[in-house]
Amino acid sequence: MNNGYYAVALDKESCNVVKRNATMDVVVGNHITLAYKPNNKTFEKLNKLCGKKVDVYIKEKRANKNIEAFWLNGMYLTETYKKLKRVDKGPAHITISHKKGFKSGDANTMFKNPTYKQDLQTEMEYLQGKIKWIIN
């Protein structure tokens, strides 16, 4: 097992767009986790994509009283427009912000029964980032 994770690290402009939507204490909004502590096969597969640009499309903003996130409509490699999928369980998302005492990973529990849901497919342009290996 590899101690780190692959993510789409959002560029500065995209981070700013995400952070402008934050309403809670701890603002995150800088990446989309693809694979956390991946096995060797997944590590090698995603390692070949490091540095590649990705276009990210937002479907909805979902939230509960503790955390809020953008739920994604899709991620595509900019160069080839090949679809990029999250390897880990749960929907691909960008944690926007959360209350103190919670962590970004708690967003996974919120997607099934959010108390707030807003469709953003026609309102938001796409975000951009690059695939990156991040060491814990």
Give the positions of each predicted feature:
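Histidine-dependent nucleotide/RNA phosphoesterase domain, centered on the 2H-phosphoesterase fold
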Residues: M1-N136
